[in-house]
UniProtKB/Swiss-Prot annotation:
Its main location: cytoplasm. It is found in: Cytoplasm. The lineage of its organism: Bacteria, Bacillati, Chloroflexota, Chloroflexia, Chloroflexales. Mg(2+) binds at S228, T249. Belongs to the TRAFAC class TrmE-Era-EngA-EngB-Septin-like GTPase superfamily. TrmE GTPase family. PANTHER family: TRNA MODIFICATION GTPASE GTPBP3 (PTHR42714), TRNA MODIFICATION GTPASE GTPBP3, MITOCHONDRIAL (PTHR42714:SF2). Keywords: Cytoplasm, GTP-binding, Hydrolase, Magnesium, Metal-binding, Nucleotide-binding, Potassium, tRNA processing. (6S)-5-formyl-5,6,7,8-tetrahydrofolate binds at R21, E82, R121, K452. Exhibits a very high intrinsic GTPase hydrolysis rate. Involved in the addition of a carboxymethylaminomethyl (cmnm) group at the wobble position (U34) of certain tRNAs, forming tRNA-cmnm(5)s(2)U34. GTP binds at residues 224-229, 243-249, 268-271, 353-355. GO terms for cellular component: cytoplasm; cytosol. Its EC number is 3.6.-.-. This is tRNA modification GTPase MnmE. One of its GO terms (biological process) is tRNA methylation.
Amino acid sequence: MNDTIAAIATPPGEGGIGIIRLSGPDAQSIALRIFRPVRPGRLRSHRVRYGHVIGPDGEVIDEALLTLMAAPHSFTREDVVEISCHGGALPVQLTLEAALAAGARLANPGEFTLRAFLNGRIDLSQAEATLDVIRAQTSAGLAIAQAQLGGWLAREVRAARTAILEPLAYITALIDFPEEGIEPQTVAGPIEQALATVERLLAGADQGMVLRNGARVVLVGRPNVGKSSLLNALLRVERAIVTPIPGTTRDTLEEMANLAGVPVVLIDTAGMRTSTDPVEQIGVERAAAALAGADLALLVFDSSQPFTPEDEAMLVATADRPTIIVWNKCDDPDVPPPPAPPHPKAMAVVACSARYGHGIDTLAKTIATTLLGGTLPAVGATHLVSNPRHRAALRRAAEFLRAAQETLAAGAATDLLAADLTGAANALGEITGETVGEDLLDMIFSRFCIGK
């Protein structure tokens, strides 16, 4: 990290401003080679200067604002300079090219955040939260990411890891003196404390994962039960074509929706039936594929029509999938829907009318509640583990800690107990970045954009 990197920090295309970011030991000197302030003088940290960006041949590229954030009071803990110019593609690109010609290197994806991590500005879980903030699709997901960026998860994990390291140091010292033996009370308490923390973090992980990553929800049923109308009602826009002709939908249609704070991909499908129409049959096959890849199925029936063999076939088709049974076309809310047919994985039954909007809010909330395991998170609940990598590391830590408890209770060899505790400590260290290799870091930071 002895060089200075530069990249465009704003999205491509036209906008109000475009930002070129530099970080490294030569950020100030490079910036002054390409930026001519209207009022001469040295750059001051966290102050904005007005001037012009100058190209390699002395030509004016654009008028701009320059902001210096001097080390260590910057995101990367290095000297950081941001040049804000007009947001057209050409001024931004020419400003970046001028910085590169003046001695900067084009940054790799996520390299600014990587430098912040390597310089101790943030831990690895906070680095990942930075990307989660950028990619958040709902306010709940954003709140979880912001809380993780604030360091709550790192504090919890470090506390659990410290509780492990103290007895581990004690046990390691005894390996060379096995005749002294382990005092169980010295070790059991910290192990129990660490395991309690890990289990508490895991308890909210399933909800956190859904709120961060979303879920795929497929609408299935025989033709003309109102699947496309339900999709439009849940989206609150006319996205799918709706006609009274069975088989109108010939392909899958995917749309993103925010249902009670849960990011959901809603998938409308062709009515599933045997057809001699080759185009419709392709649609039926795609519907089956969408069902196989869904987290939840909305099995739609027409409450105004008798139950049919095709409806029975849909019960079989969804038997291995968590399912909400939806009675559509309940246009009169005072008339109860038919009894729900038996289904081995039915999570709920909802009556609604896509035509008049009755029960649509209830359906949306039921979808969200089902995906979150039966309950919506409390208002303001942001301390939820939401990253699959973190959940996997916590699960490994819990396994090692339970094994350590069994090893201790059995009075087994000291080195076996030390191995269990070392495994738990290393698993927790993977979350904060204290025990990770370069390959994992490369994988994580490659997901970032170049300017972050």
